[in-house]
Amino acid sequence: MFDVTLLILLGLAALGFISHNTTVAVSILVLIIVRVTPLNTFFPWIEKQGLTVGIIILTIGVMAPIASGTLPSSTLLHSFENWKSLVAIAVGVFVSWLGGRGVALMGNQPQLVAGLLVGTVLGVALFRGVPVGPLIAAGLVSLIVGRQ
């Protein structure tokens, strides 16, 4: 029996590799392995908790320089003294807010996830973008189409 979903996943993984977006490619390959093995029983958990686990891991990665001391507390305190750093803080707040809207949109309208993923892969492939955009892109989409 022909599995169209598997073909789509393989195509997206290939796009990931072609566009040098190894994060997307490896993620899709892991999902393909889960799909074609008995691990597929974990899909309900992955669908329910995957985004939360991913955000936790991302937050750990972002906070690691503070926790390790690589980014000293004095540098953090000085970020409130420079207008460029204050702009960076404001943009960080805005982008975090957008990401929150994006998470809500992706949960409420999962049919948009494929479009966001394809758009991210195309942005990396065609415009030398960086593959960090699906949550922020979803947040921007939510400003246009609403959260429902």
UniProtKB/Swiss-Prot annotation:
Chain ranges passing through the membrane: 14-34, 51-71, 86-106, 121-141
Entry annotated with the keyword Transmembrane helix: yes
GO cellular component, one term: plasma membrane
Subcellular compartments: Cell membrane
Superkingdom classification of source: Bacteria
Keywords: Cell membrane, Membrane, Transmembrane, Transmembrane helix
InterPro entries linked to this entry: UPF0756_TM
Bilayer disposition of the protein: Multi-pass membrane protein
Family: Belongs to the UPF0756 family.
UniProt-listed HAMAP family: UPF0756
PANTHER family xrefs: UPF0756 MEMBRANE PROTEIN YEAL
Protein name in the entry: UPF0756 membrane protein YeaL
Organism of provenance: Salmonella arizonae (strain ATCC BAA-731 / CDC346-86 / RSK2980)
Source lineage: Bacteria, Pseudomonadati, Pseudomonadota, Gammaproteobacteria, Enterobacterales
